Amino acid sequence: MASTGLETPSYAHPVRHHNNTGAAPVPEKITILDEEKAGGPYGYPAAAGLGSDSGSIKEGADNTHRKLKARHIQLIGIGGTIGTALYVSIGRGLLNGGPASLFIAFTWCKTQKQPHQSSQHEESRAQIARAPTPRCGSMAEMVTYLPISSPFIRFAGRYVDDAFAVAAGYNFFVFEAMLVPFEVTACNVILHYWENVVPAWAVIAIVLCLYAAINLFAVKWYGETEFWCALGKVLLIVGLIIFTFIVMLGGNPLHDRFGFRFWKNPGAFAPLYYEGSLGYFLGFLQCLIQASFTIAGPDYVSMAAGEAENPRRVMPRAFKAVFYRLTAFFMLGSLAVGILVPHDDKELKAAFKEGRPGAAASPYVVAMERLRISVLPHIVNAMVLTSAFSAGNSYVYCASRSLYGLALDGKAPRFLRKCTRQGVPIYCVLAVLAIALLSFLQVSNNAAVVLQWFVNLVTASQLINFSVMCYTFIRFKKAMDAQGFDRKSLPYVGWFQPFAAWYGLIGCFVMTFVGGYTVFLPGQWDIPTFLFSYTMIGVFPIVFIGWKLIKRTKFHKPLDVDLRGEVEEIEEYQRNFVPAPHKNAVDKYFNKAFS
């Protein structure tokens, strides 16, 4: 067998098995219907989540297959994060706060994901891997140590409390699942940028059928689809950044060398609700709220950990790559829109006020039309359509895997653990697709408003998820310190921990409550907005307390946390891993380019 360059780390304590009510569950023994072919291809042990491809349905501890390559993982993280918000919705932030507020807000949000260093024996010392901290860095340290399905949800149960995992898991599941019908209807709206020929129900049916085809078969097909869609997103944002640089220097039909003109007139900052310093601060705060909900990435990377090839080598690099690329895209993207369009642009205001379809409300398209550039708006709209489709595809994957993780730990119905012979949790995927049928509400305009309510209702869930990640890491580190584990032997070690995690926790927690601040301003009280902004903040503790009272769970003491559960399986997989041969020259090129 080929060596991976990773030694099996030696830890100070043996495996702990817990049977008390509040303790972490002991992994079940895998049960495969066709036991004669339990071994996986290329030396994959079945215990590592690569069971047999025979038999129609199997049930066990974790029977997903490790078929996602490094290039898939990296583009999943980027593709799940870059959606229509970076191309279209970012214009609303420009109108609210101005170009400087928008740029500062997106930059500050990236400081909650600053880089820190990884170190894993000689191999990782030779390759300095960096990833965002505190949120992404905290997840990177835990996920690379134990790359399992639905990691941050299951880690919450192992390192904090089972009730905490239930609240976090269903919060994340509802958030991801409810965004699927939103993106499906977005695809229909984007198509209306051209013609209103295809009926809404037909577009919705086609998109849902495509999601089913991609997600109900082997995970490698999801990985391939997301790779190419995300690659298109990357090319689009890079192209738009280059476009901005060219036209600002006069490379446009009007030969207008405008540079940073709009930062001077009408200005770099825009007041919101009030004039003066208070108005400028509220404008910046509104941009900060938008950036907080827009920037993601590590959650999508971590959700693929249980299906990643060679995860202790691939995952640290994926976290590093996703951080730097998203940092560049979001910071330069927020800078670009402020260069192209003034914050008081009448066309941009009218586009959002009238709810114009597709890319019509994109600051880039508004700038193209002002500069009399004809073809590019259609290209942008086509790529925005791809972005919406890809985002919905990612939500189907993440929602189904989060539900699968809940089922694995006994927090969702047992039948949801079943996987097809290709390693797909079929009933979890079907459950998400059933929720996606809500997209047919788009057929009725009034019902479409109700659908938007659902989406707004779970918006705060994202920042709750980020807070959960940071707090879970804090408990994880306490357990490691209490049990004498040497963190330097982990596949990934972050800087400034646990202080970075506390910084991320406090920042995300505060932003969770700030999201609906506008309802508390004089004359701005609105009951629906209040409910949309704060309902999930109330639901989370209700679920947590309810499960805790019913199941009588307890917070895990640092000395009682099971830090070795399933680790031996991962280490055995790493020892026996043999890379699959490249299919062709194109496959070889992209695998090396994203390795």
Language model features with spans:
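Extracellular loop-to-transmembrane helix junctions
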Residues: 88-196, 200
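Membrane-interface loop-to-helix entry segments
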Residues: 201-264, 296, 319-327, 455-468, ...
